[in-house]
């Protein structure tokens, strides 16, 4: 099920939705004292770096703390990949999957408040997300390949109602997991 088993040369990221990555830190997660092998057998695998030759590097769990900065890591790795591929002069495909703005949003402490008074950590993290996207776009420009590059930016689904007013489904009806426009408008 790894992307590298389906045509990708390299993959760096997590294989689960973010809420699954948080589960081992929740108070009702099965305790290792009661279920010694539960986390190893059923828990999330964390952040993997995999390669088409079958190598798999486990870079560690995607904890709530790591979620604050994982997108910085993904942006840096994306930039390095762009530089490497552009220098080789070969066409390439890069699929960069940032974790923000997925619910739950974990904001790094130094970013709290950057959106200004009356704003939330969600807004602070949106600024960080914008910086990460900008970093990747700047790398394309710096590599001199912008005129021969297609960039497609999207999200996987609409917002959750419980993230209102930040979710921005208004004025559309519905939310994630419904058949209405608010679920699909991205």
Whereabouts are the PLM-identified features?
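Formylglycine-dependent
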Residues: 1-90, 98-109, 184
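Histidine-centered active-site microenvironments of extracellular/periplasmic hydrolases
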Residues: 2-6, 98, 103-109, 114-122, ...
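Stable alpha-helical elements in mature extracytoplasmic
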Residues: 4, 70, 74, 78, ...
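Sec-exported extracytoplasmic/periplasmic mature domains
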Residues: 13, 83-87, 134, 138-145
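Extended substrate-binding grooves/exosites of carbohydrate-active enzymes
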Residues: 14, 20, 118, 123-125, ...
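Short, mixed-charge, low-aromatic patches
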Residues: 29-38, 95, 165-174
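Conserved acidic
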Residues: 66, 70, 88, 118-125, ...
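Beta-strand elements within well-structured catalytic alpha/beta cores of enzymes
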Residues: 78, 92-97, 126, 133, ...
